[in-house]
Amino acid sequence: MSSNDSTAKEQSFLFNVNKIFLVIHLLMLFMFSSLGVDLMAGVSLISICFYFLAFSLTKSEKLSIYVYSVAVEILLYMILAVVCLGIQCNFQLFLIDAMFFLFSMDYVVLRKKKKNHVAILLCCVYAIALIILYMLDGFYAPLYKLDSVVIKSISIAMISGVVFLIITCMMCLLHFMSSEEGAMEKQAQFDALTELPNRFYMMAKLKNLFEAEKQGEYFLAMIDIDDFKKINDSF
């Protein structure tokens, strides 16, 4: 797979990821507006504008800017949600999702750098934020008071959303890994100069014939006709 094809694939992947985050924030806006949580409704509007603008980032060459910007946005958004409605609503659990997101993106998009220092640092920040939020629970009152039934409903919705995002993230990662494995297998089975299949590819295709009980008098002869002494060193 060429570098341009790989970059286009990564950009398409992040474009779809951005659509998922945009839909989630639209749902958050609807929920907060319905509950009268004006502060988070305003923050949701800002986040929605950010994700609309982020579509242009997914088409750029600097995809790391998009990944780390989203990571920071999730951190700030969920901390504010906990401050507004309390830890019982489970908004903080999305910080765990963000860790999956960071390391998945680090493999899929940022793997060329072969370093994940920023991802590790941000995950440490997420962990510290989680610990602080749980430690401060009970020492402050949420900015908005909600009925216990509403809180429980939000909590269930947030847990469901977290599980959905983790499953989606892992499925996307597995799909990408399978795609990369297929590309590597194809690269290993075909000669780079002639683009002809090699003996391993042929043997895999003819394996059923060789193992058949009624093979008959069929035989296979493979001859390597490459004269590497005459191949230019530029190859």
Residue ranges of each PLM-predicted region?
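N-terminal juxtamembrane segment and adjoining first transmembrane helix
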Residues: 1-69, 169-173
